[in-house]
Amino acid sequence: MYNYLDFEKPVQDLELKILELKKLAENGEAVDVADEITRLEKRSRDALRDLYKALTPWQKVQVARHSDRPHCVDYIKGLFSDFTPLAGDRNFGEDQAIVGGFARFRGEPVAIIGQEKGSDTTSRLRHNFGSVRPEGYRKAVRLMELADRFKIPLLTLVDTAGAYPGVGAEERGQAEAIARSTSACLALKVPSISVVIGEGGSGGAIAIATANRVYMLEHAIYSVISPEGAASILWRDTTRSKDAATNMKITAQDLLELKIIDAIIPEPMGGAQRAPEKVIAATGDLIAKTMKEFAGANTDFREQRREKYLAMGRSL
C-alpha cells in the first residue's frame, strides 16, 4: 500500500474512499457506484495536482525522503545493461552505501556510482541508509580512476542525507575520503553527469556530484546541511526545520535559479514515488541527450568543470 505523507491527507481520504467503493462493487455489496467512483477519481487527481503544484520547501523535503521513491538500484536496473559491480576500496573494506561499477547505457559503456538507501529494513541496514563511510568514497575514487584510464563517461546518482558521522568513520579518515573523492571528481578528463534523485546532503553528496552537468529531480533537495541540522545550529530549536528549509534554498527550482544545477527532471503528478518507471525513463532520456552533446563536443571536460565551479564561487 502507498505510504501517504502527512500533507497528503486530503488525497488519502479520497483514494481510500475510492478503494472502498471498488471493493464493495467487486463483492456485489453495492450497485451503481461507477459514476461516484469516476467523480471521486477526478476529485482525487485534481487535489493531488493542486497539492504538488504548490509544495512548500519543507514538503519537498518530505517527498525527497519518501520511502517509495525509486532508488539508485532501481535506476541501474531500469536504464543500464550488463552491469558489473565493483566492490571494496582495497584498503579497509566494502561499503554498500555506494553501489558502483561498469555497464552499458543504450549500447555505450559507462561507469556508474550511486548512493543506495535501501527499500526495506534488511536492505537499509545493509546499505547503511545511504550514509557513506570512508571506504565507500575510496571505492568511488577507484571507479573514477578506472573510468579515466579507460576513457569511459561517468554517471553518478546522488541520494544521501549525508556522510556517515560515526566514530569509526572519523577514525578511518572520513573528511579526507570526502575531500579526495571530490578532488577526483573534479580532476576527471572524461565527461561526467550527476543526477540528484532524492536527498543531496552536504559533503556526502558533493563528493560524487561535482560533475560537468548536474541535474535534479523536480522534488529532490540539495543542501549543505539538513533543515533539522540547520535549525538546531541557528535557532537551537529543531521545530523550526520548516523555516530552515525555506531559507536555505534547497529545492531544485531555487538551485536552478542560482545556477547551481543545470536542469530539472520533471516528476509525474504526485512525485516519483507514484510512477517510478516514468521518472526513470525521463532521467534516461536526459542522460542520453547530454551524452550525445558530449560526444559531439571538442571540449576539455576537466577545464570546463573547473570553470563551472569557479564561476559559482564568483557569483554567490
Curated annotation (Swiss-Prot):
Residues 40-293 form the CoA carboxyltransferase C-terminal domain. It catalyses: N(6)-carboxybiotinyl-L-lysyl-[protein] + acetyl-CoA = N(6)-biotinyl-L-lysyl-[protein] + malonyl-CoA. It is found in: Cytoplasm. InterPro entries: Acetyl_CoA_COase_a_su, ClpP/crotonase-like_dom_sf, COA_CT_C. Pfam families: ACCA. GO terms for molecular function: acetyl-CoA carboxylase activity; ATP binding; carboxyl- or carbamoyltransferase activity. Pathway: Lipid metabolism; malonyl-CoA biosynthesis; malonyl-CoA from acetyl-CoA: step 1/1. Keywords: ATP-binding, Cytoplasm, Fatty acid biosynthesis, Fatty acid metabolism, Lipid biosynthesis, Lipid metabolism, Nucleotide-binding, Transferase. GO terms for cellular component: acetyl-CoA carboxylase complex. One of its GO terms (biological process) is malonyl-CoA biosynthetic process. PROSITE patterns: COA_CT_CTER. Its EC number is 2.1.3.15. PANTHER family: ACETYL-COENZYME A CARBOXYLASE CARBOXYL TRANSFERASE SUBUNIT ALPHA, ACETYL-COENZYME A CARBOXYLASE CARBOXYL TRANSFERASE SUBUNIT ALPHA, CHLOROPLASTIC. Belongs to the AccA family. Acetyl-CoA carboxylase is a heterohexamer composed of biotin carboxyl carrier protein (AccB), biotin carboxylase (AccC) and two subunits each of ACCase subunit alpha (AccA) and ACCase subunit beta (AccD). Component of the acetyl coenzyme A carboxylase (ACC) complex. First, biotin carboxylase catalyzes the carboxylation of biotin on its carrier protein (BCCP) and then the CO(2) group is transferred by the carboxyltransferase to acetyl-CoA to form malonyl-CoA. This is Acetyl-coenzyme A carboxylase carboxyl transferase subunit alpha. The gene is accA.
